[in-house]
């Protein structure tokens, strides 16, 4: 495996940015070239989280829709694609990539509805599932 794509959706849950930086570090340490595609907000948060560019290569940050278009038109493909899923939209992107890419597909499914989301996957892919949400409670003074 020499190339990987990390596909980010809306950064509603902060854990997505941290996990992306963690994966960027590990994959790059393994000698894998990594591209990241995401919404403008997700890419901006990622860039802000790594101001000195230790993990994020600005040349390998791509608009989500443009990246999907490149995959669909077979202008680019990857050996591994990791899709972050915390909503139905993430499931749609996961299904789209499964249909247009030859990459080994891994879904990182997180959020309050993680268990329900994983049950909706009807095709072969690896899954990592964790609720990974902040538990807001009353402050005790």
PLM region spans:
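Nucleotide-activated donor-dependent transferases that construct or modify glycoconjugates
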Residues: 3-11
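Short acidic, S/G/P-rich loop/turn micro-motifs used as interaction or catalytic elements
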Residues: 11-15, 42, 85-92, 113-114
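Histidine-anchored nucleotide/phosphate-binding helix
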Residues: 17-29
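Short internal beta-strands
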Residues: 33-39, 106-111
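N-terminal beta-loop-helix "entrance" segment that forms/cooperates
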Residues: 40-62
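Glycine-rich, charge-decorated loop segments at or immediately adjacent to ligand/cofactor-binding or catalytic sites
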Residues: 47, 113-126
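N-terminal glycine-rich phosphate/adenylate-binding segment common to multiple enzyme folds
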Residues: 76-105
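Conserved small/polar residues in nucleotide/adenosyl-binding loops
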Residues: 139-141
């Amino acid at each position: 495996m020499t190339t990987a794509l990390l596909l980010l959706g809306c950064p509603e849950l902060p854990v997505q940015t941290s996990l992306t930086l963690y994966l960027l570090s590990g994959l790059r340490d393994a000698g894998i070239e990594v591209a990241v595609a995401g919404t403008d907000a997700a890419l901006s948060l990622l860039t802000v989280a790594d101001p000195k560019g230790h993990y994020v290569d600005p040349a390998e940050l791509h608009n989500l829709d443009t990246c999907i278009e490149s995959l669909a038109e077979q202008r680019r493909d990857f050996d591994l694609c990791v899709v972050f899923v915390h909503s139905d939209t993430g499931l749609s992107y996961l299904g789209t990539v499964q249909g247009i890419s030859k990459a080994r597909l891994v879904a990182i499914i997180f959020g309050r509805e993680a268990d329900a989301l994983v049950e909706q996957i009807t095709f072969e892919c690896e899954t990592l599932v964790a609720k990974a949400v902040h538990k807001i409670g009353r402050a005790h003074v």
